Amino acid sequence: MKVKICGITDMETAKRACEYGADALGFVFAESKRKITPGLAKEIIQELPANVLKIGVFVNESVEVIQKITGNCGLTHVQLHGGEDNHQIRRLNIPSIKSLGVTSESDMKNAQGYETDYILFDSPKEKFHGGNGKTFPWELLAHMPKELREKTILAGGLNTLNIEEAIRTVRPYMVDVSSGVETEGKKDVEKIKQFIIKAKECSK
């Protein structure tokens, strides 16, 4: 099971997450309490292992700005949380992830229309897109087609207490956590470690 730790804002957390086995780190460039500047993201990314995916999170940002930040920071993928369509995705010409809030099984069908490398299924948006700590009914994704499952990233309120059930139900390619590994709004490296251990054990 692949694991993504999202909302990285400091070097120490990023390095520790990689040491514990994170496969991807997320850097939020949209409005969020976890927003990071491109300058700091670049400093952190330069120190990370080459095999770890560096994913930039954007919401309804222009193609030009996304391309500039991606190039300057050394991002490997972009994660799109707004109303982006396939025309914009093709113009980006960057490996991409489309985030969709799940409210019904029909969201699986909608997901198959996006020309992205991965689909991130999340709880429906609130004030901020993602990172709100809320789960959604995972059984809505229990019967997805194999070709979609192989590119599915599961997010939305995951933590050490529910990750095993979430993986058993959805069987995604990757799981994504942010608030579920925080204490009082800050990333907690011990929670990150335990989350990664539990997620990886589920796929053995």
Swiss-Prot record:
Reaction equation(s) it catalyzes: N-(5-phospho-beta-D-ribosyl)anthranilate = 1-(2-carboxyphenylamino)-1-deoxy-D-ribulose 5-phosphate
InterPro entries, A to Z: Aldolase_TIM, PRAI_dom, RibuloseP-bd_barrel, TrpF_fam
PANTHER family assigned: N-(5'-PHOSPHORIBOSYL)ANTHRANILATE ISOMERASE
Name assigned to this protein: N-(5'-phosphoribosyl)anthranilate isomerase
Keyword Isomerase in record: yes
UniProt xrefs under HAMAP family: PRAI
A GO molecular-function annotation: phosphoribosylanthranilate isomerase activity
Family statement drawn from the similarity comment of this UniProt entry: Belongs to the TrpF family.
Keyword Amino-acid biosynthesis: yes
NCBIfam families to which the protein is assigned, alphabetical: PRK01222.1-3
Source domain of life: Bacteria
Pathway: Amino-acid biosynthesis; L-tryptophan biosynthesis; L-tryptophan from chorismate: step 3/5
EC top class, as a word: isomerase
Disulphide connectivity of cysteines: none
Organism: Bacillus anthracis
Entry keyword set: Amino-acid biosynthesis, Aromatic amino acid biosynthesis, Isomerase, Tryptophan biosynthesis
One matching Pfam family: PRAI
E.C. no: 5.3.1.24
Gene Ontology BP, a term: L-tryptophan biosynthetic process
